[in-house]
């Protein structure tokens, strides 16, 4: 198997924006990554973020120019969310504007797929709610040549229909559009909340193979089943043989993208570069999988 190994450029850094975007990009590339994920969700948490300011396009252009100069490219993104992280006073109208900015940024950076959180609601009309929310964005995404990949949520969110892989497939298929697909977050699938009766739903091989060619993006991370911890593969309890075998069996052909922020955020600064480089080697090891890992 061979997929481009990618990571979020916010991999090491927090949401206080103490380190510039370009410094983050350079450090990740020096760690060995040549493919980058732009997590726009991380950049609408505070009014200090350049993404929410008037010069956002110049900021995006600068990021693309630096990555290209250093021999790297952006190949995946994460959209802002409607029901989650945002700065104080941020309205739904603001989030919609940032969603459009993210799509146009992907077009500028040559990113083919951006990951979206669906509207995870227990409302019986959840399908209509999602269509009403995302149809306007899909229209813009088509114009920009950017695909929308809906992400699976936690297994433990039993009150929300979209916790089920089948419901996620139903949502993606309802658009009947080549610009709509699915993102699989390995950590979310593992989030059974410590309830033994839910463990059966954390079978990565079974769930991933249901997706088939709908799978357009990955969030690779691990946890211990109770907290969405975003740690490195093999530091939690996920069976990585199952994950890699499933990707092989469905013929997955897109990016292998880490969303394992805490693999690098929690180590001392003196070890950060070493940890970033380790994650690239770990990604290379995973995508080279061939019928099992040793011990």
Q: Where do the protein language model's features map onto the residues?
A:
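A short acidic, helix-capping loop that chelates divalent metal ions and anchors anionic groups
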Residues: 44-49, 83-89, 122-125, 190-193, ...
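Active-site loop/turn elements of alpha/beta-hydrolase fold enzymes
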Residues: 38-43, 79, 116-119, 153, ...
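N-terminal small/glycine-rich loop or linker at the start of catalytic domains
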Residues: 1-10, 75-86
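Glycine-rich, proline-tolerant flexible connector loops at the mouths of alpha/beta enzymes
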Residues: 37-63, 121
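Catalytic-core regions built around general acid/base machinery
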Residues: 56-69, 133-141, 205-210, 242-246
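Histidine-acidic metal/acid-base catalytic patches
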Residues: 1-34, 68, 96, 100, ...
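Active-site acidic/histidine proton-transfer and metal-coordination neighborhood
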Residues: 23, 65-73, 83-184, 191
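Hydrophobic residues within beta-strands of alpha/beta enzymes
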Residues: 36-38, 75-77, 114, 148, ...
């Amino acid at each position: 198997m061979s997929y481009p190994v990618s990571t979020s450029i916010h991999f090491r850094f927090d949401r206080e924006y103490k380190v510039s975007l370009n410094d983050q990009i350079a450090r990740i590339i020096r760690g060995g990554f040549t493919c980058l994920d732009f997590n726009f969700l991380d950049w609408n948490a505070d009014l200090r973020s350049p993404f929410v300011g008037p010069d956002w396009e110049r900021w995006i252009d600068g990021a693309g120019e630096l990555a290209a100069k250093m021999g790297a490219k952006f190949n995946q993104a994460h959209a802002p969310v409607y029901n989650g992280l945002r700065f104080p006073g941020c309205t739904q109208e603001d989030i919609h504007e940032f969603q459009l900015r993210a799509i146009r940024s992907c077009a500028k950076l040559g990113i083919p797929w951006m990951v979206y959180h669906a509207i995870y609601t227990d409302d019986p009309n959840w399908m209509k709610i999602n269509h009403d929310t995302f149809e306007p964005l899909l229209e813009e995404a088509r114009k920009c040549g950017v695909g929308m990949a809906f992400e699976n949520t936690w297994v433990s969110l039993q009150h929300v229909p979209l916790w089920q892989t089948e419901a996620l497939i139903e949502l993606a298929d309802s658009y009947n559009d080549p610009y709509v697909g699915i993102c699989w977050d390995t950590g979310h699938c593992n989030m059974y909340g410590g309830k033994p009766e839910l463990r059966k739903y954390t079978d990565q091989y079974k769930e991933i193979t249901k997706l088939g060619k709908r799978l357009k993006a990955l969030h690779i991370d691990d946890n211990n089943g109770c907290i969405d911890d975003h740690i490195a593969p093999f530091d939690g309890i996920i069976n990585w043989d199952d994950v890699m075998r499933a990707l092989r069996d469905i013929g997955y052909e897109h990016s292998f993208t880490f969303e394992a922020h805490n693999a690098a955020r929690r180590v001392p600064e003196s070890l950060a570069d070493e940890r970033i480089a380790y994650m690239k080697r770990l990604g290379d090891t995973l995508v080279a999988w061939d019928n099992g890992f040793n011990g």
